[in-house]
Every structure is written in C-alpha cells, then in structure tokens.
UniProtKB/Swiss-Prot annotation:
EC number(s) stated in the UniProt entry for this protein: 1.14.99.1
UniProt-listed CDD domains: EGF_CA, prostaglandin_endoperoxide_synthase
More info: The conversion of arachidonate to prostaglandin H2 is a 2 step reaction: a cyclooxygenase (COX) reaction which converts arachidonate to prostaglandin G2 (PGG2) and a peroxidase reaction in which PGG2 is reduced to prostaglandin H2 (PGH2). The cyclooxygenase reaction occurs in a hydrophobic channel in the core of the enzyme. The peroxidase reaction occurs at a heme-containing active site located near the protein surface. The nonsteroidal anti-inflammatory drugs (NSAIDs) binding site corresponds to the cyclooxygenase active site. Conversion of arachidonate to prostaglandin H2 is mediated by 2 different isozymes: the constitutive PTGS1 and the inducible PTGS2. PTGS1 is expressed constitutively and generally produces prostanoids acutely in response to hormonal stimuli to fine-tune physiological processes requiring instantaneous, continuous regulation (e.g. hemostasis). PTGS2 is inducible and typically produces prostanoids that mediate responses to physiological stresses such as infection and inflammation.
Record flagged with keyword Glycoprotein: yes
Membrane topology of the entry: Peripheral membrane protein
Catalysed reactions listed for this entry: (5Z,8Z,11Z,14Z)-eicosatetraenoate + AH2 + 2 O2 = prostaglandin H2 + A + H2O; (5Z,8Z,11Z,14Z)-eicosatetraenoate + 2 O2 = prostaglandin G2; prostaglandin G2 + AH2 = prostaglandin H2 + A + H2O; (9Z,12Z)-octadecadienoate + AH2 + O2 = (9R)-hydroxy-(10E,12Z)-octadecadienoate + A + H2O
Principal subcellular localisation of the protein: membrane
Keywords from the named record: Dioxygenase, Disulfide bond, EGF-like domain, Endoplasmic reticulum, Fatty acid biosynthesis, Fatty acid metabolism, Glycoprotein, Heme, Iron, Lipid biosynthesis, Lipid metabolism, Membrane, Metal-binding, Microsome, Oxidoreductase, Peroxidase, Prostaglandin biosynthesis, Prostaglandin metabolism, Signal
Annotated site location: Aspirin-acetylated serine: 536
Regulation affecting activity: The cyclooxygenase activity is inhibited by nonsteroidal anti-inflammatory drugs (NSAIDs) including ibuprofen, flurbiprofen, ketoprofen, naproxen, flurbiprofen, anirolac, fenclofenac and diclofenac.
Protein's UniProt name: Prostaglandin G/H synthase 1
Domain of life: Eukaryota
C-alpha cells in the first residue's frame, strides 16, 4: 500500500493545530434551581378536533391530525369537505328544537320510510363519536396493547390531565380545586323538590338503576378505574351474575330456568339459603329474608328487587315457551337461548321507551338492527369511565316514596326486605309509575340522603384526572362555554362558581353536566344529551345479537323467540308476568282518566 504524500499531510496538521488553539467549550451546568421548569405543552390542550397531543423534548409538542379532517400545528385548518360539512351542519340546539316541536310533521315522518333513514343517520353519527377499538384508560394516556386488551379497565375517551401541569385542570383555574363537600352542598343539594317537566316517574328511575348496574360495577378492591362487569355492555349480568359460579348458584338446572321461591302464591327470587350467593344486606337480616339475584346490591331498594323479580319471571316464562316449541332441547340450550331473547327484549325496551322518554323527541325511535347492516359498524363495546360518571342521576330520587296511602322515608325504604312481598309486584309498579321523578339538570336537586354519592363521583374524577368539562364539549362537537353565566343561564350560581373555580375552562366534568341549564321543558341540558347518547347507542347497537351473524330467527329459537324481541314492551314485561295489569309507564299519567283500576284488567297476550 502506498504511503500518503507529504502534500496531503500538511493540511491535516494545520487543522489539528487550529483545533488545539480554539477555546474550550463552555461546561454543561445544572439548571438554575430558581428557574421555572418548562410547562408540559399538552397541559394547554392545544390540539383541536380530536387531534392527539404528543410531547416532544421538554417544551415542544406535535399534534397528530391524522384522519381528523383538519391540519395545521393545532389541527385547526379544515379541508374542503370538512369545512363544507361543518358549515351545513345544524347546531344541536336547533336539532333538539326541531325534534321536540311540530308534532304533525313528525307524525307524518313516523308513518313513512323517512323514519328508518333518520334513525340510521342518528345511530351512525352518534356511534361514530365513540372510539372503537378503545383507546385510553386510567394508566395509559397513549395507545397501547394493554389499554386495548385488558377488559378489567374502564376505557376513557380523553386521556387524563398530565400529572405535571400547573393546575389540576391543566393551566386554567386555581391551584386547588374546591372542596367536594362544599361544592355538593352549595350547588347540588336539593332545597325544594323539582319534578322532571317531561313527566318522568320512579318506574323510570328504578329501571335506570337496575339496567345500568349490569355494566357499571366499579371494583372496590382495584380502584375507580377498574370494573367487575367484564361484559362491558348489555349482557344481563345483573340477572344472571357476573361470573359462572354465581350463575350456577342461581340456576335451577331444569328446563333452562332460574331458581325461585313462591310466597303468598307469587314467584319471587330465591332466598340466599336456596341460592348461596353474596348479597349486600345489613347485618342482622337472616339469609332466608335475603333474596338472591345476579347483582349483589339490589337488596338496597325495593324498586331494584321489583325489576329483578319481573325479569326472573320473564326468563322462566320464555323458557316454557321455548320448551313447548323445542321439546328436544336440553337445559343448557334453553337457558342460553332465553338469555339472548331477554337481551333483545331489554334493548328493545331501552331504545323505544326508555330513551324515547329521555329524549322528549316526536321522532319515534326504533330498534331494528338491520338498519345498520348496509353501513360500517363494529359490534363490540367497552364501557368508559366518563359514561359511568355521567350516569349518576341521583336527582331522579324523590324526598320520600309514596306507595298507596303510605309515605315511606329513606330510612323506611332502604333495605326494606318485606315491602315487595307485602304489597306485591302490581301495587309497586302502579305506585312507582304514578310518582314523579326529579329533574336531573340545572343543579340543586339531589336529596341529602344520596348527596354523598355525588361527592364520591367528584372525588373519583379528580383521582382519575378527568379533563375539564369544556374539553369534553369540544370532543363531542359542541361549542365550549365562554362563561359560567352561559353555562347556568343565571347570575347568582354563576358568580359563586366563578369564585370557586376561577375560570370556566377549569370546571370539572360531572359538576358541569349537572349544573348546565336544562333545555326547554327537558330533564337535563345539552351536554348530557350530546355526550350521553353516543355512549348509550354504541353500547346498545354494538351488542353481538345486533350483528348480521346473530340477528336471525334461528339464534332465538325460531320465529317464536324472534317475535318476543320484536314485540317487547315495558307493559308486556309487567302484565305477562302478573295476575292483574297495573298502570305501567315511564311517565306519570297525563290525566286521571288515561288508566283504570289495576284489579279490573287481567293479563293477556298484549
């Protein structure tokens, strides 16, 4: 190999000499302890329109605007199609007004094919607001396999407020949030009972509690971010239990039926002596007086055990119908098919009567899974912690409970183990259907006996660092409120909230939902509808029985089972499982003459 020539060596030597003559670089010193640490830029929630904030280095960020329809540093520049769609989209306030007025127009729509078209639009637009597959949870504020696969977690729609933010709500508001007890007593505690202007009753209130406790089962051992309801939807775990062991204790293992006991000639859930499952009753209540059902807390309220009794009777009634239709089926097939039928009946009642009552719409809602078969839809659901918090509707509860001529206080009503049997199903259904429930929104309408529940919800939301109320409004396509006065629609409460929070952008999620001014003649405000409806509809229509693979007569034992679902109503649930047919509805009677004495009407195939 030839040596390098002297002419090439000279420039290298000169370069080394110059480097030696350069002054040394300044030493790397630790940061000044007195200098303020850089604020996590994601604490400002800079990314709009569902853009994802990614922190870069210490004080920089990037917004991932992929498939949002927007671009720019903060996902604020719409593309042409997004701009056009946003410009033409009517406001939620206008849509709500349209759906709750001009009755003659909606009577025409309900009688035509337009109804199905509108229902399909409502279902797809609402459901598309819920991320599927699920994204975040209590421990993962970024996309991860654990957040997707671990069903022990509640999912969450928005990631938590970063831990290193200047204030609990990001950068807005005060360094310390107001005391939860003070907040509840000043803004949520009832002064005078405010009835729901839509006429919602206690039959509705107890249905809401009974229905939602199948998928809202926060784990006391693991913490508020975890659930014991691993089905994450309408699986009727509150009827059959949330584990195979509990289910087996409740089953008769004959003709597909559930265990039961007969008291005064009527069928009720079995006692804990007959079905040894854990039920939460006060100490001193003997096992023979404890009724055993799928949800361990249903002994708390006679209204919950009332629905547990109705669904037990319905299960065993459907088993008899299937047994007559399929005499060769064994116990397991009868049980499993009946469970699917009851899931379908539940969803039908929820959409066409329960949600219908909540909405106040003149558009007649319809449960027909086939409406979605022509569009892209994911038949899977994960319950979100925001949905769990949103659904704490304790303002529904009255000051006392009226059954016949007797008025019961909370102390007399809670854990009353004899009321259901003493009065019977018909009398309680009639009483609960006639008593008004409270208005949910607008604030100051939670009875003091249940106010502690709202306090715990606020504390849990802080533990899980839920983003501010306005961030959730933006996430669900709503305009953020500019002031507390705009939120509440009045000045006194707005001034008090301003004093406690300091900034409307620091208002917490749950207080915002309950303190928002109600829509005209409505049970709650705009946000409860626009945020709650997507969770609800995605959970209902995302059920496997609504999929093309499941939604066929053979799944439900033929036309007999399929027709049970398609014709299910709240009235049928009650009147086909009682000796007489009481007044039953999700709203109080409109007039004294629209129903008659319960004992005069016998149950028939309605």
């Amino acid at each position: 190999m030839s040596r390098s020539s002297p002419s090439l060596r000279l420039p290298v030597l000169l370069l080394l000499l110059l480097l030696l003559l350069l002054p040394p670089p300044p030493p790397v010193l630790p940061a000044d302890p007195g200098a303020p640490a850089p604020v996590n830029p994601c604490c400002y929630f800079p990314c709009q329109h569902q853009g994802v904030c990614v922190r870069v280095a210490l004080d920089r960020y990037q917004c991932d605007c992929t498939r949002t329809g927007y671009s720019g540093p903060n996902c604020t520049v719409p593309d042409l199609w997004t701009w056009l769609r946003s410009s033409l989209r009517p406001s939620p306030t206008f849509v709500h007004y349209l759906l709750t007025h001009v009755r003659w127009f909606w009577e025409f729509v309900n009688a035509t094919f337009i109804r199905d078209t509108l229902m399909r639009l409502v279902l797809t637009v609402r459901s598309n607001l819920i991320p599927s597959p699920p994204t975040y949870n209590l421990d993962y504020d970024y996309i991860s396999w654990e957040a997707f696969s671990n069903v022990s977690y509640y999912t969450r729609v928005l990631p938590s407020v970063p831990k290193d933010c200047p204030t609990p709500m990001g950068t807005k508001g005060k360094k310390q949030l107001p005391d939860a007890q003070v907040l509840a007593h000043r803004f949520l505690l009832r002064r005078t009972f405010i009835p729901d202007p839509q006429g919602t009753n206690l039959m509705f209130a107890f249905f809401a509690q009974h229905f939602t406790h199948q998928f809202f089962k926060t784990s006391g051992k693991m913490g508020p971010g975890f659930t014991k309801a691993l089905g994450h939807g309408v699986d009727l775990g509150h009827i059959y239990g949330d584990s195979l062991e509990r289910q087996y204790h409740l089953r008769l293992f004959k003709d597909g039926k559930l265990k039961y006991q007969v008291l005064d000639g009527e069928v009720y859930p079995p006692s804990v002596e007959e079905a040894p499952v854990l039920m939460h009753y006060p100490r001193g209540v003997p096992p023979r007086s404890q009724m055993a059902v799928g949800q361990e807390v249903f002994g708390l309220l006679p209204g919950l055990m009332l629905y547990a009794t109705l669904w037990l009777r319905e299960h065993n009634r459907v088993c008899d119908l299937l047994k007559a239709e399929h005499p060769t089926w064994d116990d397991e097939q009868l049980f499993q098919t009946t469970r699917l039928i009851l899931i379908g009946e539940t969803i039908k009642i929820v959409i066409e009567e329960y949600v219908q009552q909540l909405s106040g719409y003149f558009l007649q809602l319809k449960f027909d899974p086939e409406m979605l078969f022509s569009v892209q839809f994911q038949y899977r659901n994960r319950i979100a912690m925001e949905f769990n918090h949103l659904y704490h509707w304790h303002p529904l509860m009255p000051d006392s409970f009226q059954v016949g001529s007797q008025e019961y206080s909370y102390e007399q009503f809670l854990f009353n183990t004899s009321m259901l049997v003493d009065y019977g199903v018909e009398a309680l259904v009639d009483a609960f259907s006639r008593q008004s429930a409270g208005r949910i929104g607008g604030g100051r309408n939670i009875d003091h006996h249940v106010l502690h529940v709202a306090v715990e919800v606020i504390k849990e939301s802080r533990e899980m660092r839920l983003q501010p109320f306005n961030e959730y409004r933006k996430r669900f396509g709503l305009k953020p409120y500019a002031s507390f006065q705009e939120l509440t629609g009045e000045t006194e409460m707005a001034a008090e909230l301003e004093e406690l929070y300091g900034d409307i952008d620091a208002l917490e999620f749950y207080p915002g939902l309950l303190l928002e001014k109600c829509q005209p003649n409505s049970i709650f405000g705009e946000s409860m509808i626009e945020i709650g409806a997507p969770f609800s509809l995605k959970g209902l229509l995302g059920n496997p029985i609504c999929s093309p693979e499941y939604w066929k007569p053979s799944t439900f034992g033929g036309e007999v089972g399929s027709n049970l679902i398609k014709t299910a109503t709240l009235k049928k649930l009650v009147c086909l499982n009682t000796k007489t047919c009481p007044y039953v509805s999700f709203r109080v009677p409109r007039s004294s003459g629209d129903d008659g004495p319960a004992a005069e009407r016998r149950s028939t195939e309605l």
